[in-house]
Amino acid sequence: MPITPQEALQRTIEHREIFHDEMVELMRQVMRGEVSDMMVAAILTGLRVKKETIGEIAGAATVMREFSRRVDVADRQHMVDIVGTGGDGSDTFNISTCAMFVAAAGGAKVAKHGNRSVSSKSGSADALEALGAVIELQPEQVASALAHTGIGFMYAPVHHPAMKVVAPVRREMGVRTIFNILGPLTNPAGSPNILMGVFHPDLVGIQARVLHELGAERALVVWGRDGMDELSLGAGTLVGELRDGQVREYEVHPEDFGIAMSASRNLKVADAAQSRAMLLQVLDNVPGPALDIVALNAGAALYVAGVAHSIADGVLRARAVIADGSARARVDAYVAYTRQLAVQA
């Protein structure tokens, strides 16, 4: 017998786990619109207070993937997603979006899953639009862009139409719920490798283990001690690395990669226009902390994608493709190709 919403709520109140298979059935009910908004809000609150388990998160992510519009990719070698949970409140420029262009120029295939801004000044979708790209591409168009440019951006609302069911509840609640940590786990292209930033240190080990449960090959889950959901320049970064079926947790520092420490306030922007300007400065090889943090995160992406032998090797490769202009050229190629796809449609 599948668990009822009332039974699920009772479990969370008693701080007991909803088991993986039960969570799968419960989430299917939610995604089909069979659970009332009041009950959805109550269960989400209960899970948040209790703290979601690996099995609960993996079960919910499985269903979100099931209900998503998939992107079919034939060649997954060196494929990676660079994504964050958001919600770190740092208001920095779009580091992961900038790192996407650098990693693609460095030899990775970047299937990036993202959305508009929720808590920051500029989300990945906002940044790409500011650059002139068309973001609302259909799954087959994303696959085409990935094949031709090494970049495929999957705009979450296009690929997760069932999420409309819970959108009003999430908006009215106005607090983080399990859905904030599900987004980065539900890449519609099924990227086998992922660099994921998280908003809380507890999630470093949890998300790495969830990714293992979901069949990921390699992952780096990161949280900066200054609160950033990226590899940080302002403090050490906690890392949960999934490789060869094992999760290892450790800490890295910018100095490990020959990078000077710098406070995150040096990376702050007020809006998408400022974020675009800082992103293009990095890709024009203007020295400074913005370039350093992009090189660090793109380097980590190249490592987890299997292009680089280590994060340090990845950082060197990232700096090289920024310096020779190929990362900047990748922006122009991607923007032009998405516009071409939109015209053809």
Swiss-Prot record:
The protein's annotated pathway: Amino-acid biosynthesis; L-tryptophan biosynthesis; L-tryptophan from chorismate: step 2/5
SUPFAM superfamilies, per the entry: Nucleoside phosphorylase/phosphoribosyltransferase catalytic domain, Nucleoside phosphorylase/phosphoribosyltransferase N-terminal domain
Coiled coil ranges: none
Residue positions binding anthranilate 1: G84, N115
Cofactor remark: Binds 2 magnesium ions per monomer.
Keywords: Amino-acid biosynthesis, Aromatic amino acid biosynthesis, Glycosyltransferase, Magnesium, Metal-binding, Transferase, Tryptophan biosynthesis
Residues where anthranilate 2 binds: R170
Cofactor: Mg(2+)
Catalytic activity, as annotated: N-(5-phospho-beta-D-ribosyl)anthranilate + diphosphate = 5-phospho-alpha-D-ribose 1-diphosphate + anthranilate
Any one GO cellular component localisation term in the record: cytosol
Example GO biological process: L-tryptophan biosynthetic process
Residues that bind 5-phospho-alpha-D-ribose 1-diphosphate: 84, 87-88, 92, 94-97, 112-120, 124
A GO molecular-function annotation: anthranilate phosphoribosyltransferase activity
UniProt-annotated binding residues for Mg(2+) 1: S96, E230
Family assignment from sequence similarity: Belongs to the anthranilate phosphoribosyltransferase family.
Protein name as catalogued: Anthranilate phosphoribosyltransferase
Biological source species: Xanthomonas euvesicatoria pv. vesicatoria (strain 85-10) (Xanthomonas campestris pv. vesicatoria)
Gene coding for it: trpD
